[in-house]
Each structure stands twice: as C-alpha cells, then as structure tokens.
Amino acid sequence: MPIFHAHDGTELAYRLLGKGAPLICLPGGPMRAGAYLGDLGGLSAHRQLVVLDLRGSGDSAAPEDPTSYRCDRLTDDIEALREHLGEERIDLLAHSASGNLASLYAARHPQRLRTLTLVTPGTRAVGITVTDGDWLEASELRREEPWFADARAALDDFLAGRSSDRAAVAPFAYGRWDETARAHAAAGPGQTNSAAAPVFYQDGVFDPAATNAALAAVTAPVLVLAGEYDAGPTPDRAAELVALFPDAEFVVQRGAAHFPWLDDPGAFVRAVAAFLDPEVHSVQAGGTRLAHRVWGDPSAPPVVLAHGRCGDSRTWIPIAERLAAQHRVYAFDFRGHGLSDWPGRYSFELFRDDLHAFLEARNLAGATVIGHSMGAAAACLLAVREPGLIGRLVLEEMPPPFPLDPPRARAERPDGELDFDWPVVPSTDAQLNAPDPDWSERLGEITAPTLVIGGGPTSRIAQEELIRLAGRIPDGRFVTIDAGHLVHTDRPEEFLAELRAFGLS
C-alpha cells in the first residue's frame, strides 16, 4: 500500500482502486480500517478511489500521541494526504462516523474542496443528534423481516443500557441480511481500533455552532446520501444536514440501510457517479432521480432530447452540441437507463411521466421536445395528455401505437453488465404487442406542430405505420431519412437539416 507522512510524522497508508481522477474515501467506524469499503460497489469504475486507513487503523501506524485520534485533529491527516497527492482541490467521500470528520474538514478548508459526498454520515459535528426514537422508528420499517423479533429485543436492551452487544442489532444496519452482510458485519470488530474509537468522540471535540456557521460558506457541491432504513442518520436527520450547505443534493437510496453500496451497488454507484461527473446533473422528478446533461445559453430557447430504449443521454451529445449554438439543450436519462434511478417498474406511461416531471422540475413548458424511439413514444403520450406543454414535437422512429403483427417474441437478456435495467425490455415489448387503443385514438388531440422522422426501408419500424401516425396528428408531417432506426446518430447532418426545415434555427 502507498504511504505518506502526517504533519506529526505518523506513517499513514492508503489503497488505490481504479483509474481516473482521485476520490479520497474516509472510512467510518469510527476508526475502522478502510477495507470494509471495498470498491464501494464498483465506484472504482468511474473514479480512482484513494481509500485512507485512519491513523492507528488498518496499515496505518499508531501515533505517539493518542489524543491525535480526536476527530477534530484528524482533519490534519486529510490535508496532509491532499498535499501528498499534489491536488489543489479534492473530491472527498466520507462514510458514517467520518461524516463528522469530513464536515470539520469542509469547515476548516473550504477552498480545498471540489466536491463532498457524505454517505449515511455521522452528524454529531453539526449538533444533529440521533435519538433512541430514531432507532425505534427505523427498526419498525423492518418488522416483516424474519430476524426482526430477536434483533428488536436486542435493540431494546441496548437502548436501555442492559446490553452492549452490537452484533445482535447488526441486521438493522443492512438492507439485506444475507451471507454477504453477515460476513461484512462479522469483520467489523477485527477492523476497528476499539481503543481509539472513544477518543474520536472525546468531550470537547465538536463545536456545532462554529462548524455550522463555517459550512454555510462552503461553495463546493455536496451530496448527502441516506439509506431508507438507516437509523444513524434517518433520512429526516440527513435532510437536516443537507440544509446546512448552500449547494447540496439529497438522495435517499430505497431499500438501503447503513451500507448502501452493499445493499444495491448499482443504485449507489449511479447516484454518486452522477454527482461526481461535472457534466451530469440530477433532479428529483416525481420521486425519481433523473440524471441529465445541459448545453448552451440558459436564456436561449429550450430543447429537450429524449433517448430511446436501452440508450441514455450520451447518445444525443453530438446533436446537442450542434443545437446548443442557438438553444439551451437538455438531454436526460429515463428511469432504468444510464445514471438515473432504476426502480424496477417500467411502462411507456411511466416514461411519459418522467418527461412530464422533468419539464416541470426545470420549468421548461413550451420547450421543443425531440424523442427517439421509446423517448418519442413518451413524448407523444405527453403531448396527448398535456396539450400546450410542448411547443414543438419531433418523433424520430417512434414505435407506432398500433398492434404489432406478428408480435415481438420474448427477448433474452444479453450476458454481462448493462447500461440499462433489463426489465425495461419485456415490460415495453408487452405494451408494443398490445398497445392501449387510447394511444392511437387520441392522436388527434395533439396541438403541437409535429415532425415524424422515419428511417426508411432499412428501419425495423414499419414506415407505413409512421406515415399513418403522422396523418392522425392535426399539424403533423412525415419525412424519411434513409438511415435505419438510428437516424440522429447515423445521419446527423440530414437529421439537423430536417430540424432546421421544421423551424429550429
């Protein structure tokens, strides 16, 4: 493991996982070695993780002065690591008890932070107390678990001071109490410096009033990620922490407790990776986090790009960069795609609702909406339901709202990892085979000028059905670009030319 020296000469170790821009990761415990973080559910595929072993834990040396285990003094070790890495500013992630440490570092060195990610963070440093009531309330969410009765009895004993057996209440710390969680919990005592842990929280370590005043001046973006089932902190307590920062995002990971990268690695990585990517933003739209990219002058006329099935906002980047010369361009990831939430339930109506919620969240009424394939279907359904919300509508290779003959056969999931949630495919295939008759019967209610673009004879979409679709829209017209299904990616110049002819400058 690489080593460096703290300002007092203590030798400190860290692990490097993955490639890319460094993300310093602080383990919790307190004073637990960083090994329990693993690669944070695969976050190392997006950033190089610099996982620090706090002094006296893991492969880091014990200091000569044991009072240097105090949380307020450990901020100097983060600063020494920043200097060692040669970084002017750092991206910092902290879990659990080290949320306190990261908050103190942010208060003392705000100019050194590029971003701050707080994962199920400790909140003592800012004066937010996790109460016995929080533990009991969170435990009630797990009442249907087979282990609940024994764990709840142990929790009652623990809170009443009749027991100090943390292992008995460990199931509450995990969204799934399976073999992986059991092994993770069992490793905890051997990874923790139990003598140093009390010093971390020593009396006088925290000055919440001073810390909170300093955090109010932190300009770096902050992500606070809470677990739905976590007690320390509960989502409500985590929301109090969010309010202390001027520029903070808040994510509650569903089905997760205190170790969210174990409970659902994909959900955790998508949320954190979206936050850390400077080109990606997130909005909460209808209860779903939607990741999106933005180009162009904020005062320019807005254009929203909706991707097709199994794609994401990146498929639009070349087109978006061209449109951004005279438009404010937004491209977002639908649920179940890219870096947005993957809730597991999908339908064209839900994708329609994603688009609607995104337009409302970004105040984009009257925008031009350009949709490809599935995204076009979502836009079409929205234009029917909300006349006047969309200014102009472009439907590229939209699956026609007429029954397929023959119907699509059952699709087999490809091997390996996917950039989308596989249940999207069978869910939408079922709807394409037998669409709601209302979809086609209400096409005449669309008031937006509409351009329907077909990919010609090499497309898998029946072009005569697209002509039929355009004919049912009062202000609709149909054009062909001989490109197959991926018109905007395979024939971008012709695609842009048709947009200009349609009225987009």
Give the positions of each predicted feature.
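Active-site loop/oxyanion-hole signature of alpha/beta-hydrolase fold enzymes
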Residues: 54-97, 262, 270, 293, ...
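Flexible "cap/lid" loop of the alpha/beta hydrolase fold
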Residues: 115-157, 380-385, 391-417
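Conserved HGGG/HGGXW glycine-rich cap/lid loop of the alpha/beta-hydrolase fold
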Residues: 6-67, 291-341
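Catalytic active-site module of serine/aspartate enzymes centered on a nucleophile-bearing elbow/loop
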Residues: 248-279, 476-505
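Conserved alpha/beta-hydrolase "acid-adjacent" motif
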Residues: 231-237, 459-465
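Short beta-strand/loop motif that positions the catalytic acidic residue
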Residues: 218, 224-226, 446, 452-454
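Conserved alpha/beta-hydrolase catalytic His-Asp/Glu region
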Residues: 151-200, 204, 401-450, 456-457, ...
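Gly/Ala-rich beta-loop-alpha elbow adjacent to hydrolase catalytic centers
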Residues: 94-98, 102, 371, 375, ...
